[in-house]
């Protein structure tokens, strides 16, 4: 049937900030949905709190709300916009849960809003563990033996009482009075949420105890309606069982967990299915997990298509997945169904399904070229699959054709355990990865080895790895333990075990990885041994065969004690180069006009390898992306790359994107003119450029927008004679090189904190003695503040040098100095020295984003950090415009920024970080590239500064580039205030201290917008998941130098009814200054103490600042308790002041919602 005409406007709910389990893939799906529905003529209303997304660009939707994604806030948007329909399937678990809450609150009914894409009943049936189990039983599909722990009975009673009150209100009032009365009733219901949750948890815990006797141990615990396995896990003993149950019940919005029999070691598969109103169902892609059951699919290495199923097994699974969609009632759109198969007897069970587009949907879309989100959006408004064209084949096939692929795709997740000292790297059913890489090859081996080097963790392939505890004598058991424990390094452990003599059968017994995959890895390991023994082949045929197995030049070089350049030269001499094939959805059955490509060294049975690159004769620019997401380098850089592609297209260049991240908008087939899905290594990029230079004109390469990843390639590209657009690699090096940068600052008469540089352990001690404590230390050339720390004393310095720095030593240096820790460190520091700075206490940190064309410059935004200097800028909340700085300071910041931009001959973007102490300005660092604040600034000032920067880099003047996008921004004309807040994954890493420092640990960000600073801050907190209390008790414990300053926020809270609780010294000070407060013990002073009060929910807000290292350690348990109880916790005075202002503003009146477009119009 054609599209629906009874719907005029559609509300799309985004996914909010990037968190573990919900990343860029929902910006990709949301962006596709916005474009697809807007081109059909619908009015699009979008809500998303994440400013770093493409979907929140003001030209993508008609009304773009950068507001917190909570049911209460979205209800206000619905009341204001009155959409006809709501599409909740594009924003992950956040959107689904919000839509269901809106339905339960009666908002959808009140405003006559229809849920499209997935009905509420279908979402409930898929996400509610009990309903799903019953549905599977009904259609004859097996599920794991399981029992539920929930509080359904008492919840139903509460809900009935609430519904009865709603009916009374409806009978009593009408019109505006009815709306007010219903809002009041809902507010009262929300205020009782904490008390109800406690009752439900107690009831469900009792049920869990009964379930344990039936299901037994080990048991898999899966909370309902959660994201990425949040709160779940595998329990091997009773203590673990009740810990995970409590965590899972707390994480589940419905206070329900499923307790399943153990299926550890079974094989895991996924099916991506699309269905339309006419019951046409197609399988987009089958996905197989290399890791057996027990590891969350988001943390598993996966391949597409599934490689170890027989055709019969595949057909059974295919039919089963379609039956699941029909029974659950997913009428339109994409869904993901997960299966497990017992390899011992072939028993197949259904694990779960997602009735929405998901992380796997994004992977399947990129793996096949089939745009699941775009098609799902069109199906939601009435189209059927046969009415839609397949874009990839240029309409030669309809969307109802099942994709067929003639290559293998491998996805490997990327982790960040090094950012969370004390966290366990063991993988379970709760997702922990922060990003992923995807690689494509004609064979599994080629695809796998490309993915390994695409991870950007320093691997060149199956690099050697040390087996833990192997030196303790029991070699066989140490190896079995290493390969039997799921960790990020498990696959390399498997290869190492084979090098040490274990057979495929022995490795399979320990790891439960399918023997077929192990045979492929064994083949690579045996080939490596032959290369070590005989060297590289000197003929084209045999060298091409090695490359076809996925070996990188760097890996071949390390196996033969050569340089990668030597291998590249041998390849060039023998004319061994990759060819480029197209992703066409149809295994080359139809010609594809879409330039979506991957490289392969395939060796055909006859003839020469054929390239499908079809290079154009246009003027072209290559944009290098950021690779897999990681902490410190995420969606913000992908946003910049996308904007560069859009801007270059506007300027009539052919935009060519190179990236390997399947989650992102940059790897969508229609973001750029040509897309190469390839690892971002010098070898892979230079091969692409070799092909692209064969026709047309290569204007240059952009390395400035993808974070540290492309910057690392700048020297190799320059050495190869490739033109680099924008700021020169030498200027980038000047800003990174401490000695050269210091000379530049002296020349410009600009300040920086007293500092030093150390090329050895001994020199580090001397520099620290010269500077004095406290000081900041960091390795050179890092992004996200990796291994950056504030050192308070000699003991801290010793721990840093002997514990932290060794973790940075690469494997090749460790191998060179196996038993010499100091030798390893000094070798590392010889190339990458340690940088020391005096730590500026009590300083205000400022971020400045600037554009420059080499001569003229313009400051786009000056952001004042709410956290003091010393906390990584990526983890700090900040405001734009500045909140407390004087106009004179702002003018001086602009002058110094302009001086730096001109001196560095910046072409494009530059970010400068300043610290202001006692009115004096210090430069902390300069980054002559795009920074992670670019999207936030662009959304605040209303100018697409990344697009402007790309035009400047292509050769336009600052003036002309701005004119192309509506002229220069006018900061003084902006009455609104934006606050950015960071979002952290601490709940995923039990035992990790939540105290912030100079090493970045946030995964995402949100933005609060308002005309009032306090309300903008409140929105940012709410968007980040921090529920600011309107009443209750504030706990205060601050260091002596903060006592005077804490009086303001505490008095403000006391004046609006808050009780105050404080530790000894702080409580005496507050009482002496007229603030009534109650004394409570510190943790070290005996019980009952502050942690008990937090856990007993007697405290609702925490202000806690510490100075010495021991005080930081003492307060760790308080920080952990506040995290587990989801309490707002502020560790700086600026944060406490802002929180008090925000709470007072919320108490005075409710939040108002406005679209971004209104802010710009005003």
Curated annotation (Swiss-Prot):
GO CC annotation: cytoplasm
Residues holding Mn(2+) 2: 352, 354
Top-level taxon: Bacteria
ATP-grasp domain ranges (all copies): 186-381, 742-954
Binding residue positions for Mg(2+) 3: 913, 925
Keyword annotations: Amino-acid biosynthesis, Arginine biosynthesis, ATP-binding, Ligase, Magnesium, Manganese, Metal-binding, Nucleotide-binding, Pyrimidine biosynthesis, Repeat
Region: Oligomerization domain, residue numbers: 457-613
InterPro entries given in the database record: ATP-grasp, CarbamoylP_synth_lsu, CarbamoylP_synth_lsu_oligo, CarbamoylP_synth_lsu_oligo_sf, CbamoylP_synth_lsu-like_ATP-bd, CbamoylP_synth_lsu_CPSase_dom, MGS-like_dom, MGS-like_dom_sf
Domain MGS-like: 1026-1162
Cofactor binding, note field: Binds 4 Mg(2+) or Mn(2+) ions per subunit.
Binding site residues for ATP 2: 778, 838, 840, 845, 870-873, 913, 925
Enzyme class of the recorded protein, top EC level: ligase
Stretches for region Carbamoyl phosphate synthetic domain: 614-1025
Binding, ATP 1: 129, 222, 228-229, 261, 263, 268, 294-296, 338, 352
Pathway assigned in UniProt: Amino-acid biosynthesis; L-arginine biosynthesis; carbamoyl phosphate from bicarbonate: step 1/1; Pyrimidine metabolism; UMP biosynthesis via de novo pathway; (S)-dihydroorotate from bicarbonate: step 1/3
Function statement: Large subunit of the glutamine-dependent carbamoyl phosphate synthetase (CPSase). CPSase catalyzes the formation of carbamoyl phosphate from the ammonia moiety of glutamine, carbonate, and phosphate donated by ATP, constituting the first step of 2 biosynthetic pathways, one leading to arginine and/or urea and the other to pyrimidine nucleotides.
Protein name: Carbamoyl phosphate synthase large chain
Native species: Brucella suis biovar 1 (strain 1330)
Lineage: Bacteria, Pseudomonadati, Pseudomonadota, Alphaproteobacteria, Hyphomicrobiales
UniProt gene name: carB
